[in-house]
Amino acid sequence: MKSGVAYITVQQFCTFHGCETLIIEEFMDHGIIEVQRQRDVVLIPEAQVPRIERALRLRNELGVNAAGIDIILRLLEHIEGRRWREVEDFEDFE
């Protein structure tokens, strides 16, 4: 585990969000999220929580499967990254 990084267990996340641990395991299997393992406990870094919540919404509200979620999240991150670069380029221009 990385020092200074906050974690929650998969069980805590699932209890709070009312979802099955199998869903999180499916996300892990498809590389949608990154987790840490400490003995028999799977830990979610705090920074991954918004990504998992977004993945859950895509799955539950739109019925997107894990492969589709992976593609959608990658595209959204690419778009968001481009926006930040455009903002930085604009600020450099001023």
Locations of regions flagged by a protein language model:
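Arg/Lys-rich, alpha-helical DNA-contact motif
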Residues: K2-T15, L22-E25, D29-E94
